[in-house]
Amino acid sequence: GGSAPAVLNAANEVAVAAFLGARLAFDRIPELIEHTLEGVAVIPLSSIEDVFAADEAARECAQLWLARNAEGVLQEPLRIPA
């Protein structure tokens, strides 16, 4: 409950973007999400500002994890046809 869904969503968005950008292997997506869920405090949400704050904290935590743990995994970013 609380801010956990916002944290989960933000971590997932960062992880998928990193995967599509060839910075994160697909099988490491859960690791990044788990780290973010453990690293960002879950708080009760009483306003939309609380949701935005949880999202921002989660994205920052996930980006820090990426900076320390990600490596170039693919030769080039994944291209998804339109």
Residue ranges and their predicted role:
Residues G1-A82:
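Catalytic, metal-anchored helix/loop core of enzyme active sites in primary metabolism
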